[in-house]
């Protein structure tokens, strides 16, 4: 090599790619969840689909469990796999905290939607029956890729229907241990978001008191989530109402997130773990659309393809179902993320 130049690092292996789907989306829009999921599978040809097993839908009354909703969605995927060359697998999300508004999906009979009552409900026999029965029911499914335990459990998500809904560390320890006990063959991961750039992530991990004094934006709990689960799932949004520096290009903001992924991947590797991008923005923010476009989605995909990720799940299927241009962009983004070698990063 001339001038002592080092050879470039080999590109990261292509991640498994897919999307998150909730039947609540289709029900709210007066659509058929099975039809919508089938459409998404056919159009995007994913490797993975993340599905929720909602506590409130599964255990509408104490002592009664009904897995009909989840079973129907899994059957849609099984039907798809019978004729598809790419076999789709699922990540099942279980717990009181699950993805999609209002974040805490606890049944009304469980009591007030906040701590400490939430913690007491999760220690009760009914919640634990739901949790254990879900693990036992699906652990032998050939569709199962992994479990996600709770959704952003350490993060406070404020809304008008929920109070302090963070899951206690003790409860998370029990749930992860229970998943390992009842299903040692599949990983149990959990999720969070991060600060808006890697410098603040570093401060949070190493100088917490300084970070607390500096922060003005949601920070998440990536260090705690990494320590808790078998992999770290990051939910990353580059354009929304809480996004600082919206004057910067989406490509630049995405590159900041990619730097954070590399930082947390190094931390994960030291623990024998990996990082997943469990929510990659693939739609404009609903209440504050900003300027996130379908082209920005493709830019983000090219940036993230150069990051060390094992799983990437796009977020925004309700937009794709309503707009063919977004469905096409999502499909193209998955193709970019699957490229066998890293792609040139776009200009910032």
Predicted regions and their residues:
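Substrate-binding cleft of secreted/luminal carbohydrate-active enzymes
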Residues: 89, 273-347
